Amino acid sequence: MTLDQKGLKKRSVTVAYFFNNIGKKHDIRLRRMNTVDEQERRIFERDLHRPGLALAGFTNLFTYKRLQILGNTETRFLNHLGEEERKAAFANLTRFKVPCIILTSNNKLQPELLDMATAAGIPVYVTRQSSTKAIYLVTDFLDDQFSLYQQYHGSMVDVYGVGVLLTGKSGLGKSEIALDLVERGHGLVADDVVVIRRKGETMQLSASRNNIIDHFMEIRGLGVVDVKANFGIRAIRDVKEVLVVVELLEWNKEMEYERLGLDTKTIRILGVDVPLVQLPIFPGKNITVIIEVVALNFLLKRYSNYVAAEALTDRIKKVIHNDDRTAGDILV
């Protein structure tokens, strides 16, 4: 099985989408300073720019496609100029197709500069946040928007706080297992279509649902189940980090399966290696409980560096090498 498909990436986001959504995910409130067509302006990069040199007249390397931040330094510079000089300096911004301008620390633009931005179709916003915090929050939001992502067939469940991705051929019962885990008190992130993102250069993968399918599940023989309506808000999760992948396999008596758990397998998703557990399916096997144990084993290894197979192996080695014991003692 391979999940290392080439990641997709947004080319741009509209300024309208940015304005309408950043406040939902981050502690930053933007207020409009003018009225222009926000749908027409697009943001192409996650990085921001403070246009101090551009305002001073040096525009050779002006990264105008980035969102522009005007903080205390930039606004004070403009304010200390005469009216004509101020207009000339601000024209170094408005003659480019800048996505939008954000004024931090509740700074203001002179009315004539605001009119210039409006005439150029540049949205202008203001926030009470400092430049440092605003840059951090806006960059984090855009990092999410421009992150690598891919859609996978499977189910994503939060088991004891561990994000477990269930994969395998269609018809093996991934949705039924996910539903059983929800009934046992765990949380459903997504079923059937799982959207996985890798943020920036981090080694973290986050999984979320497809917005159309939402938290609905299709159970063969039963039909569509609304997990949120049936089990309540405690049964769903919006986003969860992918920490373990469980691949469900059809039972094959000719195949050799892992028995001790000493060999750690991994699978690559969007360039990140994730622990992999392969579970054969056959009648009478309680997969739900086994997946709970998979999650608990992961927590034991992460926080206590404890692996049951290694502990048992060490114990047997100590007994075998103990000269004071007899072969009979070993079997007792």
From Swiss-Prot:
Keywords annotated in UniProt: ATP-binding, Kinase, Magnesium, Metal-binding, Multifunctional enzyme, Nucleotide-binding, Serine/threonine-protein kinase, Transferase
SUPFAM superfamilies: HprK N-terminal domain-like (SSF75138), PEP carboxykinase-like (SSF53795)
Known catalytic reactions: [HPr protein]-L-serine + ATP = [HPr protein]-O-phospho-L-serine + ADP + H(+); [HPr protein]-O-phospho-L-serine + phosphate + H(+) = [HPr protein]-L-serine + diphosphate
UniProt: ATP binding residues: G168, K169, S170, G171, L172, G173, K174, S175
DNA repair keyword on record: no
Superkingdom: Bacteria
Region feature (Important for the catalytic mechanism of dephosphorylation): 280-285
Membrane spanning stretches: none
NCBIfam families in the cross-refs: hpr-ser (TIGR00679)
Enzyme nomenclature, EC number: 2.7.11.-, 2.7.4.-
Recorded family membership: Belongs to the HPrK/P family.
Gene: hprK
Pfam families: Hpr_kinase_C, Hpr_kinase_N
Organism field: Chlorobium luteolum (strain DSM 273 / BCRC 81028 / 2530) (Pelodictyon luteolum)
Cofactors required: Mg(2+)
Annotated function: Catalyzes the ATP- as well as the pyrophosphate-dependent phosphorylation of a specific serine residue in HPr, a phosphocarrier protein of the phosphoenolpyruvate-dependent sugar phosphotransferase system (PTS). HprK/P also catalyzes the pyrophosphate-producing, inorganic phosphate-dependent dephosphorylation (phosphorolysis) of seryl-phosphorylated HPr (P-Ser-HPr).
GO molecular function term, any single one: protein serine/threonine/tyrosine kinase activity
Quaternary structure and interacting proteins, as annotated: Homohexamer.
Extra remark beyond the main annotation: Both phosphorylation and phosphorolysis are carried out by the same active site and suggest a common mechanism for both reactions.
Binding-site residues, Mg(2+): S175, E218
Protein name: HPr kinase/phosphorylase
HAMAP family: HPr_kinase (MF_01249)
Chain positions covered by the region annotation Important for the catalytic mechanism of both phosphorylation and dephosphorylation: 217-226
PANTHER family linked to this entry: HPR KINASE_PHOSPHORYLASE, PROTEIN YJDM-RELATED
Active-site residues from the entry: H153, K174, D192, R259
A Gene Ontology biological process term: regulation of carbohydrate metabolic process
Domain notes: The Walker A ATP-binding motif also binds Pi and PPi.
CDD domains in alphabetical order: HprK_C (cd01918)
